[in-house]
Amino acid sequence: GYAVVLVDGSQEMCKAAAALCGQESVCSTFAEYAPQGSFDGIWACASLLHLSREVVRSVVKKLMASLQPGGCFYMSFKYGDFSGERNGRFFTDLTEVSLQDVLLGLNDVERVESRITLDVRPGRAAEKWLNVYLMKRR
């Protein structure tokens, strides 16, 4: 029984998520999203990778500000240095080094961990992901 806020920029995805979870969703881009209240945790699995690096930085800062002290923030990106259009969609890939640039200026982060994992989807075993775990200072 967790209370969650469903956020996506796609009307169709918002409808599907609301139907699946049985609650309303917020249809908003992450750049425009204005968190209401505060959160114990944020789960952004492959959610922010379609933003430019500059926008990722500002969104991460905004979302970190909405976390309770001691709150956790998970996000993932395709692993690499690429930024641009791929297969008709925009992607920002990150490495451990470019992640540090995204996190620059976040003074309320107590702990940062990252792990590289392989994609588990069929036919994509060679693709890598950068998984990032942040904890807000208590």
Listing of model-derived features with the role each one plays in the protein:
Residues 108-120:
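Conserved S-adenosyl-L-methionine
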Residues 31-42:
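A short acidic, Gly/Pro-enriched loop at the edge of an enzyme's catalytic core
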Residues 91-107:
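Short alpha-helix
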Residues 119-138:
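Core SAM-dependent methyltransferase catalytic element
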Residues 70-77:
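Conserved beta-strand signature within the Rossmann-like core of class I S-adenosyl-L-methionine
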Residues 57-69:
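A short glycine-rich, Lys/Arg-flanked "PGG" loop and its adjoining helix->strand segment in the class I
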Residues 40-55:
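A short SAM/SAH-binding and catalytic strip from SAM-dependent methyltransferases
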Residues 1-33:
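Class I SAM-dependent methyltransferase SAM/SAH-binding core
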